[in-house]
Amino acid sequence: MISYSSIAKASLKDVWEHFIYKIDNPQHFVPGVSNIIIKEKNDDYVIRQMNIQMKDGPKNKVVEKITSVPYHVKFEIIEHLVFTVHVDNFAEFISEKETKVTYAMHWKNKATGEMQTNETIIKDAVLKTIAFIEGY
């Protein structure tokens, strides 16, 4: 598992609202996302399909099952050619104007069993999320 945390200059309520918005609009939060399709949505989960273009890598189609409870959103990839993956997004109250944002990524290569350890991926996603929340 790799994780990264940073502080958003926003209330917990604002961060949480952006986390929920991210379910339907990941392109504002995750680098390299395109062709987003919400395949199913109910009170318990969302099934989302999209393409992700990794930096200097191939474009991959992924299908995710997304669940959310305050203040945690879990993105579990249920269709990916190379990896088994789940990513957790956490929001933690710091003060009325600051919230700790943490992403934890559990990526495992299906063929080799090797865990993904590229911390730049998760750091870039957290920083892009915070920049969007803060309006940059």
Predicted regions and their residues:
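Short amphipathic alpha-helical signal-transduction/dimerization elements
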Residues: 23, 126-134
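Hydrophobic ligand-binding cavity/cleft-lining segments
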Residues: 1-43
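Beta-strand/loop substructures that line and gate deep hydrophobic ligand-binding cavities in soluble
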Residues: 76-128
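A general secondary-structure signal for short beta-strands and their flanking turns/coil
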Residues: 1-3, 45, 84, 98
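Glycine-rich portal/gate segments that line the openings of hydrophobic small-molecule binding cavities
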Residues: 37-80
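Beta-strand elements of well-folded, non-transmembrane domains
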Residues: 8-12, 54-56, 105-109
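Hydrophobic/aromatic beta-strand elements that line small-molecule binding cavities or substrate pockets
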Residues: 4-6, 35-38, 61-67, 85-94
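A short, structured loop/turn motif at beta-sheet edges
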Residues: 12, 39-44, 67-69, 92-100
